[in-house]
Amino acid sequence: MAKKVVAMIKLALPAGKANPAPPVGPALGQHGVNIMAFCKEYNAKTADQAGMVIPVEISVFEDRSFTFVLKTPPASVLIRKAAGVERGSNQPNKTKVGSITQDQLREIAQTKMPDLNANDIEAAMKIVAGTARNMGVTIKE
């Protein structure tokens, strides 16, 4: 019989840099999960994506074992990296902080495609373009 899931934990952690300190320790510790085992597995799976923030969804079972699913990096992180800016604009309608090309937009949309609620790449590009607009990043033709 399948194991019963007792908790779903969502965290966004830097790739390859999970450690038992907060937020990982308290989130997993309260469910009795082996924190070091999670940190080692997560760091091993995300070592090739250094510098990115990778969201993770952890399922904790009643016997205290766990499984986790890695998601794609947030669109805002990918847009900031493509535009070469530290952070988005605090007034996106007035001040623009950078710009990305259509090709970069398509690349980001393809990366995000598994996690987006979109049927084709064009719809995914519109979703990512909306995120860019809200960050004060313009899209060049």
UniProtKB/Swiss-Prot annotation:
Pfam families registered for this protein in UniProt: Ribosomal_L11, Ribosomal_L11_N
GO biological process, any: translation
Domain of life: Bacteria
GO (cellular component) term, any one: cytosolic large ribosomal subunit
Molecular function as annotated in GO: large ribosomal subunit rRNA binding; structural constituent of ribosome
Its job: Forms part of the ribosomal stalk which helps the ribosome interact with GTP-bound translation factors.
Protein family per UniProt: Belongs to the universal ribosomal protein uL11 family.
Binding partners and assembly: Part of the ribosomal stalk of the 50S ribosomal subunit. Interacts with L10 and the large rRNA to form the base of the stalk. L10 forms an elongated spine to which L12 dimers bind in a sequential fashion forming a multimeric L10(L12)X complex.
Protein's name according to its UniProt entry: Large ribosomal subunit protein uL11
Gene that this polypeptide is encoded by: rplK
